[in-house]
Each structure stands twice: as structure tokens, then as C-alpha cells.
Amino acid sequence: MEGRGFSGLYKNSSEELFLKTVMESPIGMPVPTMEMLGFKTVSQSFRADSEELFKRWLTNEEGYNSTSMGLNSRLSKRISTELVNVSNQQHVGVASEGRNNDKSCLQNSFLTNDVSGDFNFPIREPVDRELQSGNLFLAKAWFLTDQRMTRSRSSELRRRYTEMQNTQAPQGLDSMFMAPKHDANIIKEELAHFNGFDYLSMCEIPSQKGSFMSPSNSSSSTFNTQQLVDVDKVSSCVSMLKGTLQRKRLECQVEKDAAEDGLNEIFGIREPLFQSGFNEGQENWNHQKLVNVQGDFTDQVKDTGVIETLEGAANFVLEGFANQTSQIHGGTASGEPSQSESSAAAPVISSGLDACEGPSNSSQTLCDSSWKQVGESTQNRAKGVREQIMDNLKDDRKRKRLERYGSVTSAVSDDKVDTTKKRRVERSRKMAEAKERNLTPTIPSDMQAVMKRCENLEKEVRSLKLNLSFMNRKDSEQTKQIEDLQKQNEELADEKERLLEEIERLLSETGKI
């Protein structure tokens, strides 16, 4: 497990660890939720395939043959080993922040090898194994179907799971989740005895509640300790199965926010980068939630260069948040006693980020300064990105304005030919011509009458010219016909003379006879 990251553990065994705790719980202890295991800050996208993981786990781990029992014990041992590693990564490294990193890794691996075998003894009892097989049989009967996990399906699972839990004998909560301070010290001494280390401060409380417990006994704190209430097992189980619905709802909400917010609101500071809340009634600490800066930026800005710059800024925010996690836990896990007068007060819940009113010796100033440095660097980086984006937008507007007025080269204008622009230019030209005609100087009325008469005469002349041309065309045709008739008349006259001569000749011959 050395060198294995927090997200890698979540990908491989977090779902199996959670479900194993649900189905193999021997004394009815409350099911540790993902918030208790410390996975609150991990992205919601890792829970997309929770239903598929649950089905595969039930199918492979129920134990149809004889070899499954040994496999089950080996898997239990591996899961418990990973559980101890999770606790060590969260708490042991925080409590020993004064030591170097190499020594911390050696302690974590040594603690894992020694304690892993002792975490499994309640699971291997015969009665618990029989109860586990019954639970697995009921669970597999529910989840071997191919139906998708919907709201109605989730309600049915909740009802059946409640009936199954009611049939079992109710037992008390595990002292690990309700342990007071002296019980925590006992567990701490036992773990220290296994490993030979005596400075483990927060490893005894595996829940997320314990990671924020401060041993300070200052009476100036505003929160009072209350006993932990019972955690709803059904809600913890069904919340994992409804991961897909929650992820889709979150994506819809993000898209809706991106559509409503404008470009100016994105560049402004809309909300703090990290949000924290504390519910005093239920005593559940909500981790800091990272605002989805990258999603909003990439939805609004379409330029490739701008997108790369914004992704770099978002990655910077994520890296800063990851680097500050250990420092925050170090501030909250301070083991030095308070200097106030009240030494018998119960442990109080300390956020590690609020200012202390009493003279408590902790590393809150270190956390505050670290958060301030992260905030200032992030603000400066975001300011530079905002200025660059605004400059690019201004340049784009100037270029479009110059193209509209024709101040850019013809190549750019030819590339963006627009019919609307052509119609606008033609309309403006016609309006200019009409305006020039309307700007002629005024003349007297008699001159206007004369000009009107002249215009009428011009029209008549044009009509007469048309008529004359028509008549000339007609005359030319008639002239041609007349010439043809005259030629025929001459031919007929010649023929008449010839006939007359012939008649005279015949008469003369007749007279001679």
C-alpha cells in the first residue's frame, strides 16, 4: 500500500469495504457512511457504477462452493488492511507531522501488518458467518435482477431492508462510535502496544467525527459536546445505491447554473472556493466542497486558448486544495492541552479554521496563514486570467467593428460575405440619390408651369417621332408596292401595243384578199 493515493484506494476497495461492513456487522453497529470513511471530498463521479460494483460483489462473494470460505477470509483480511491504511493516512500522518515523511511511511506499513489480523476476529465467528450468509442470500435476491435503480426501486429496497433488520435482535451500538475520551485512550494504548509507538493521537476514532475532535478543554468554545445519535443503516445503504441519481441531479444543477450565470458573473467572485458547514443537531461535519470552476469556465468560453488557460487555473485550485489537506488535519489534531482554567470540561468540537478566544496552543495560525496564501495566490491567478480574457474579447469586438465599417483589408471582407450587408449598402445608395434629387433649388410657379409644358411637349414629340417612324416604315412598304405596280403597268402597255400591231397586220391582209 506504500505510495498508494487516496483516490486509488477509493477506486479499488471503497465500495467493497462499505458493503462488507453492512452485511457482516455482527453486533448491529451503525454502518459507516462515505462521510465517516473520509471520502466526502472525493469527486462524485467515482460513484457512478456503485450498483454494478454491488452486484458483482454479491455474485462473486456469496460462496457457492467450498473454496469460497477461504476466499472470503482472505478478502476480509485484505479489506481490513486497507481500512487500517485509510486510518493511518488520515490520522497517523497528521499526528506525527513533526517527523519526516520516510518515517511516516514506515510506521504506516508496520501498523498495517500488525493490526490487520486483529480487526477480523468478530467476522469469523460461526454465528456471525451464518447470519452473514442469510443476509447475503436476501441481498442477492434483490440485486440479481437487471432493472435499473430508480426511485421506486430504491423505495422497495428500503422497505425490504427495514423488514430484514427488524427481524434481527437489536443490539447496542459499538463503543467505537460512541466512545468517550477514556475509551479512546484505551484503544490508543492498545494500538500503540501492537506497534511500539505511543504517539498515535487520532487513529482510535475511525469516523470522520473523530478527525475533528480537539483535546482542548477551553471553556471559551461556543459548541457543547452531545452524544452521537444512531446512524440510519438503511439511509447509508440506499444512499450508495442512489449514487447515479444524485450524480445526474448534480449535473443538471450545474448546467442550469451555467446557463443562468453570465460572463461577468463568472469572472467575479460569486462564492468562496471552499464551503464548510456544521449541523449541531445531528453533529455531522461537512467537508469543504470545491466549487466547480472548470465546468463553468469551459461552458461559457469557446476560445481554445482561453479554455486551456482556464483549465490551468482550475487545476491550480485543485492542487492547492489537495496540498492543504494535511495541514488542516494537523491543525485540528493538536494534542497539546489547553492552558485555560477549566480542565474538567468535556472535549469540544473544533473546526480548526475558526479563531480561538482562549490562549489555546494549537496550529490554527498555521492553517489560517496557509489558507490565506492559497486564497491570495488563487485570486491573483484568477485576476490575470480575467484580464487576459477581457482583452481578447475587446480585440474581437474591435475587429468586428472594423469589418462592419469596411476598414479591414478586402480579403477579410471577402471571406465574410453577407447578403444583408449588400442589401443595406444598396438601400443607403438609393436613399442618397433620392436626397440629391430633393435638394434642387426652388423656382417660381410660372417657370414651373413652363417646365411642365415643356415636359409635356417633349412627351408629344417623342410620341410623334414614334408615329413618324411607324409611318415611314409603312411608306416604304407602300412605295415598294407602287413601284411593282408601275412595272406591271409598263409591261401591260407594251403588250397592248404589240397586240394592236398584230391586229393591224391581220386587217391589212384581210383587205388585200
Swiss-Prot record:
Localization: Nucleus
Ranges of Low complexity composition bias in the record: 334-347
Name listed for the protein in its UniProt record: Protein CYCLOPS
Organism expressing this protein natively: Pisum sativum (Garden pea)
InterPro entries: CYCLOPS
Name of the gene: CYCLOPS
A cellular component term, taken from the record's GO annotations: nucleus
Disruption-associated phenotype: No visible phenotype under normal growth conditions, but roots of mutant plants are impaired in the interaction with rhizobia, specifically in infection thread (IT) formation in symbiotic roots.
Source taxon at top rank: Eukaryota
Region (Disordered): 327-435
Keyword Thylakoid appears in the UniProt entry: no
